[in-house]
Regions:
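Short amphipathic
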Residues: 45-60, 97-102
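Residues at beta-strand starts and edge strands
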Residues: 50, 91-96, 147-151
Length: 174
């Protein structure tokens, strides 16, 4: 229904604008206790010896439901959180592994719009470009009924992909 789609887009725009207002407010607050906590504060990046891990505390939009605001919020958060790792993979072929966790039983993983994650990594210059000479990616979906949906992103040198994937699959199966 077109009305529902327009309504959802409006809600996403409102959410994005509220997040921006909170970000601006927090920028000028002197006392840390007065800062407002919100979803974007829960994005995390951790550097390990051989890879970079990003935690995204929200649902990745589906292709059919994607709009500029959901895409933009995820892209800008990934960019902001990873910019301290600029040039980490300069001139490297990089593999980006995206694990999407939903709390529903049936996930149609090929309908997830992961471009916002890759674009954030390019904008922060963690990876040089998203063309085939610089990166490739894979997406894994799983369901955890008792948890809120989230996404984990692992970035590492492409040559490490096979070993890493084998370890990941073995750990997830146990």
């Amino acid at each position: 229904n077109k009305h529902i789609e327009n309504y959802l887009r409006s809600l996403e725009r409102i959410r994005y604008n509220i997040f921006n207002k909170i970000k601006q407010y927090n920028k000028y607050v002197v006392n840390e206790d007065e800062k407002l906590m919100y979803l974007n504060d829960r994005y995390e990046v951790t550097k390990f010896e051989n890879y970079l891990k990003i935690y995204i505390p929200e649902v990745i939009p589906k292709y059919k439901n994607v709009n500029n605001y959901a895409y933009k919020n995820i892209t800008l958060n990934v960019m902001e959180k990873t910019k301290i790792y600029k040039d980490l993979y300069k001139d490297e072929l990089v593999f980006v592994f995206i694990k999407i966790v939903e709390n529903q039983k049936n996930i149609d993983i090929d309908n997830k719009f992961v471009k916002s994650i890759i674009d954030g990594l390019v904008l922060s210059k963690v990876i040089e470009d998203d063309n085939i000479a610089n990166m490739f990616y894979g997406v894994f979906g799983t369901s955890e009924k008792k948890k809120k949906p989230y996404t984990e992103v692992y970035i590492f040198k492409g040559k490490m992909m096979l070993d890493w994937l084998q370890n990941f699959i073995n750990a997830d199966i146990k």
